[in-house]
UniProtKB/Swiss-Prot annotation:
Domain of life: Archaea
SMART domains: Ribosomal_S6e (SM01405)
Name of protein: Small ribosomal subunit protein eS6
GO biological process, one term: translation
Keyword Ribonucleoprotein applies: yes
Gene for this chain: rps6e
Molecular-function annotations in GO: structural constituent of ribosome
Keywords: Ribonucleoprotein, Ribosomal protein
Cellular component GO terms, alphabetical: ribonucleoprotein complex; ribosome
Matching HAMAP family: Ribosomal_eS6
Organism: Methanococcus maripaludis (strain C6 / ATCC BAA-1332)
InterPro entries: Ribosomal_eS6, Ribosomal_eS6_arc
Family in the record: Belongs to the eukaryotic ribosomal protein eS6 family.
Length: 124
């Protein structure tokens, strides 16, 4: 199973996509910090911020486990409220990465020695 890992650079506002076959990500939760070596970014530390499964259902931080659930939502990730007081039942994935998850969103917490994305640093 291949994971697409999107790494967001908080300094520049750019994001970079990597693919990995690593099983080290299975069992990790939203909010956990992982080593950048999982996606060949030596020296980087990444924080998991979300993701989606093979059917496109978003992961949500307050649903524990790796299963897919239909939950009643007022707001937050996975549902955008159109009018005040409106609630809706939506299918969402839990906060734990499993083999069904295909996309993992991360952000950089600690930067490594090499520039992100293989771009040369501007030394001017």
């Amino acid at each position: 199973m291949a994971f697409k890992v999107v790494v967001s650079d908080t300094k520049s506002g750019k994001s970079y996509q990597f693919e990995t076959e690593s099983t080290a990500l299975i069992g990790k939760k939203i909010g956990d910090e992982i080593s950048g070596s999982v996606v060949e970014l030596e020296g980087y530390k990444l924080k998991i911020t979300g993701g989606s499964d093979k059917c496109g259902f978003a992961m949500r931080h307050d649903i524990h486990g790796a299963m897919k659930m239909r939950v009643l939502l007022k707001n937050g990730p996975g549902y955008n409220v159109k009018e005040k007081g409106l609630r809706r039942r939506k299918s969402l994935r839990g906060n734990t990465i499993s083999k069904d998850v295909t996309l993992i969103n991360t952000k950089v917490v600690e930067y490594g020695p090499a520039p992100l994305g293989g771009e040369p640093e501007n030394t001017e």
